[in-house]
Amino acid sequence: MFKRIALVCALFSGVCFAEGKQLLDKVVAIVNDNVITSSELNAQVELSKKQIIAQNMQMPDESVLRKQVLQHLIDVDLEMQMAKQNGITIENAEIDEAIEKIAASNHLNLSQMRDEITKQGISWQEYRQNIRKEMLISRVQQKAVGKDIIVTNEQVDQYLKTAGRIENSNLTYHLKNIVIPLSEEPTTRQLQRAKIEAENLLNKIKKGEDFSRLAIEESSGEFALEGGDLGERHLAELPEVFAKEVVHMKVGQVAGPIRAGNGFHLIKLVAVGGENQRHVITQTHVRHILLKPDASMVPSEAIKQVNNIYRQIQSGKDFALMAKQYSLDAASAVKGGDLGWVNPGELVPEFEKTMNSLPLHKVSKPVKTQYGWHLIEVIARRQKDDSEAFKKQQVRQFLQQRKFVEAVQNWQQHLRSQAYINIVDKDLA
């Protein structure tokens, strides 16, 4: 239930378990002008152990885990440096909003949330700092590659056309993966060594060794410390080289080595989800009258006038005639305020919330939005099978996510290639 709460602190170093800090802390690695200390590493190792236990995964060897955790901290540090260089900041109000969403998703209020965090040995301030770090990294990734992620209508149509010929293309796939990394421009020898390493791991798995433990020990992937668990993905979200494999795999099967841009991959199919169901939406036929302050009408006059119009309609005046006479939404005023049939999410939240709560043919009291004051009337409602449009929108989002993940991986690889990284503690090299 509280996986998301724990995960935030498992992802980032912070000082979540900083008891007994020493005045002089040993440096274990140098990353450009920054250092990673032994206390930071120890704190992250302890958090990773807790996460491994919570997910019922086999605990890897201590020395191997420390090496993997350090590599993770290096990646995080590089991205935090980029956030600082780009002047990216997170306001306290944004952190508050993020925490409220996490609490709500776990069916907790903020007081209960604090209690759960405290039970994990983490102070509220430290938890907020880790949330800030997570948001910073997300934002710097968006700034670095997000603007280049474009999915065209042609790409969506082409995917749907191709997927239509693939059996089980509408299913979801729960995968784990192990990544054996490659440099940006690997030599033939480096390619051979990485492929042999991946093949050796595959042989270990075939002989019965635990996939998740090997992912924690050996993978360079983003989800290595979670046992390589990618979660449940739609086919369109997966790299094409993965998608071609998974549709032919059986649950429990491991495939690879698969060559991708950032290295050789082993993938395990954990489970297959059900086929997407029909998507039915409620459309609303709605009309409105808009009054807003302008050069000729101060706010108090706008409020006074919209209330006066409301009273007249309640007394029997025709809504359409009043809209034509008074509404400042020119496009709909000529049609008696008619906005036509609207889909969920097309109108601003305050308007839509009131609209959805109205019985048919009942006019709302004045509603304030960013555009001004509205009187709203629902003329009719109907159910519409929106499956095709919904599927296209889903595919667009999945393709965007696929491109984003691949772009972030390439960007992270480039960051490492351009950075000065010195692992001072040779036991961790």
Curated annotation (Swiss-Prot):
Signal peptide positions (record): 1-18
A GO BP annotation: Gram-negative-bacterium-type cell outer membrane assembly
Top-tier EC class: isomerase
Domain PpiC as annotated: residue spans: 170-271, 281-380
UniProt KW keywords: Chaperone, Isomerase, Periplasm, Repeat, Rotamase, Signal
Source superkingdom: Bacteria
UniProt-annotated location(s): Periplasm
A family per Pfam: Rotamase
GO cellular component, one term: outer membrane-bounded periplasmic space
Keyword Repeat recorded: yes
GO molecular function, one term: unfolded protein binding
InterPro entries per the UniProt record, alphabetical: OMP_Chaperone_SurA, PPIase_dom_sf, PPIase_PpiC, PPIase_SurA, SurA_N, Trigger_fact/SurA_dom_sf
Catalysed reactions, semicolon-separated: [protein]-peptidylproline (omega=180) = [protein]-peptidylproline (omega=0)
EC number(s) stated in the UniProt entry for this protein: 5.2.1.8
Record Gene3D superfamilies: 3.10.50.40, Porin chaperone SurA, peptide-binding domain (1.10.4030.10)
Main location: periplasm
Function of the protein: Chaperone involved in the correct folding and assembly of outer membrane proteins. Recognizes specific patterns of aromatic residues and the orientation of their side chains, which are found more frequently in integral outer membrane proteins. May act in both early periplasmic and late outer membrane-associated steps of protein maturation.
Domain notes from UniProt: The PPIase activity resides only in the second parvulin domain. The N-terminal region and the C-terminal tail are necessary and sufficient for the chaperone activity of SurA. The PPIase activity is dispensable for SurA to function as a chaperone. The N-terminal region and the C-terminal tail are also required for porin recognition.
Protein name: Chaperone SurA
Gene responsible for this protein: surA
